[in-house]
Structures are given as C-alpha cells and as structure tokens.
C-alpha cells in the first residue's frame, strides 16, 4: 500500500507481519459507560504488496481465537465460550482483502471479507501507512495502522443482558491493528 515513489520494494513483494511488532486489539462498551479493551496474542498476516498496481495487492490476516486477552481471566473465558467466539468450534478469525484504494497521502482503504464463527461479511479497514524503513538487523519494513468497526451480532455473537436498564455489551466493536510488515526473502 505504497506509492511507486515511496517504496524500494520490487513489485508484488511478499510481506509477513513481525509478531513482535504487530498487535490486533478490540474495544467494546461495557454497560454503556466503560470501554473494555483486549487483544489477540496469536496473529499471522501475510500478503503481496504491489506499489505500482494496488489491485494486485492482497493481504490475509489469521487470528487464533483462543489467544484473546482482556486482563480478566473470567471475561476471557466468557469470550472464548459459546456466547461469543466459541473457540472450540471456531479456532480462527480471518480477513482476506479484495481491494485496496488510495484515499490520499498515506491513507488507504482495504476492503475484504471478515469471517468470525463461520459467518463472513464484507469489511473495510481504514489504513494509515506510518512509514517504511530498512533495518540492517531486522530487514525491510512497512509500518501501518488500520481500524474498522463491526457489529458483533452480524457474526453470531448475539448474547446480551440488561442490567439496570443498560446493555452489558455494546453491539459495536472497534478493531485496531498496528504493526510492521517485513519483506520476505524470495526463494
């Protein structure tokens, strides 16, 4: 997701996420008052980026659902259970891109299919390219951030309860991805 002047990568270069510098986070309202945040500890991102032809760019994200963390073991177990992610049946969340659009400057939209609990819906990620650099130790890298908002009920996570007139969990969930993609050496 770079312009030809911005990248030194050869066309259709394969990239992978650096797991030490990549995070997928989420946020949802609890009782309409507080934002609960969490992340997934096991995420893989791979793809091909062609700086000359955005339509040749494709990315795939795979998240291991059991790796969900919110700093609360009871809540994590609830999120892994059947009311939410149902990790024993659905071990992964996937996103497969279909189109990239350059919005302007360092901003892009990355549209594709998000699959959670066996249900797939189109989602558009709003992407900001933070920069690109060559690190002699760690390789050629592109740094980015992306975000989207989804309705969890669209993906079969319909549990909710009213407490004192307030819903326990918001329907809207914000997804935030930040990280570094590393150019994979070509064989």
For each predicted feature, which ranges?
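Low-complexity, acidic/polar, glycine-enriched regions of mature
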Residues: 1-187
């Amino acid at each position: 997701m770079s312009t030809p002047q911005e990248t030194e990568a050869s066309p259709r270069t394969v990239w992978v996420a650096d797991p030490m510098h990549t995070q997928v986070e989420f946020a949802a309202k609890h009782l309409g008052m507080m934002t609960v945040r969490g992340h997934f500890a096991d995420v893989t991102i791979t793809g091909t980026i062609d700086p000359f032809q955005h339509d040749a760019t494709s990315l795939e994200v795979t998240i291991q659902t059991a790796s969900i963390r919110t700093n609360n073991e009871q809540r994590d177990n609830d999120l892994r259970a059947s009311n939410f992610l149902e990790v024993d049946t659905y071990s992964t969340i996937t996103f497969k891109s279909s189109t990239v659009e350059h919005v302007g400057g360092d901003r892009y939209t990355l549209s594709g299919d998000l699959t959670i609990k066996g249900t797939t819906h189109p989602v558009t990620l709003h992407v900001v390219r933070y920069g690109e650099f060559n690190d002699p130790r760690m390789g050629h890298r592109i740094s980015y951030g992306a975000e989207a908002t989804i309705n969890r009920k669209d993906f079969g996570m319909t549990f909710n309860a009213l407490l004192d007139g307030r819903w326990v969990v918001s329907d809207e969930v914000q997804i935030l991805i930040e990280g570094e993609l590393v150019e994979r050496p070509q064989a």
